[in-house]
Amino acid sequence: MMKKQSRNHNIIKIILANEERKYLGLTPIESHWERVDIKHVTLFFDGDVIRKKITHAEFESQQFSYLEEDVCVETAENRTIVLPKTLRGKPKKLNYTATTMFTRIGMYFMYNDGYVKIANATTQKTHYWTRIEGEEDKKLFDEWFDTWKNETTEEDLRELEVFKNETRKKQKYKEGDVFAFKIGRRNYGFGKIIIDVVSRRKAEEFRKNKNYGLAHLMGTALIVKVYHKMSDTKDIDIAELERCCSLPGQAVMDNHIYYNQYPIIGNLPVSNVDMNDAYLSVSRSINYNDSDIAYLQYGLIYKEIPLSEYKKHEEEHWPAYRNEGIGFCLDIDGLEDCTKEKSNDKYFEINTNDLRAPEHAKDREIIFKLFGLDASLDYQGNLELCKQ
């Protein structure tokens, strides 16, 4: 059972029991560790070293939250001073502000705002992530955790122990690489890198052609496609994926692939059929030195028109078709429904401003024509138009 602590300045502090920690891969609290509370943060000391930090909801009126992290923070002067980690650093008073600067190590568990995450800070990998629907309170957490524990098998515990003790691994990637990713606790999905923006940005031809729709993407960007396929194992015949539909191409930072969160399981050369699912963005230029144009980016196809032509249509929802957002995680909302229905309708119900959505077919036709392309043609057909 969870230990429920007394109130302190409107805070109800909950501490997991060691028996419960094993289900989350968390380090047990040793019997000789001493507890110190600073506002809504609970610290556990092993002598003068802080070994664990648990953060609770700040006030009783807030939604229930729980974040448990392992740390290794040395203190001095009767635990009132945090010692620096480097020679250049300066000692700091141990207070709430100081605790926000602690660097987590190893396993951590987060339950906050309906999100659940079990992860390893050292390897930068996530073992499990989900979003729980319902009113955010401790009862909802208890229901989730009871189900989690009851469904945990010995094999699950072994996998969690392996995950806990992994070292950080990096993997090289290239266009065409097929990767696997976890869906829920025991299923896998599959994706493919169709444009390695990181590498292409280094090419003179890429810069010469501007490619603003790709160049403006933040960070170490990749364009990937996610297949309509789910499996209880990542060990599949990747040739099967060639026969699968996919979600529309999306931009994602490379972190989860680079740090092996999404293991690469093979390579299938990128074809123009893959590029039919390519990323599509239309926008007026945001480049101060090239502000008199608007552009369309369709995969590696880049086209421009005078801004004056684009402005004639700005009242027609066109500004919403700029599609240059990017994050660390794949956008797989609706993937299960899309896979079952063999359709991307559910995806487009969520991503309503995507120009590739069927409901925007008329706008897509007009926009493609304005930029010298043809929305009725596939990617290969539009490549041929560009050569004329």
Name what the model sees in each region.
Residues 2-132, 274-388:
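N-terminal intrinsically disordered, low-complexity, charge/repeat-rich segments that act as generic
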Residues 136-227:
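Short N-terminal edge-element motif at the start of the domain
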Residues 200-277:
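Structured domain cores in non-transmembrane regions
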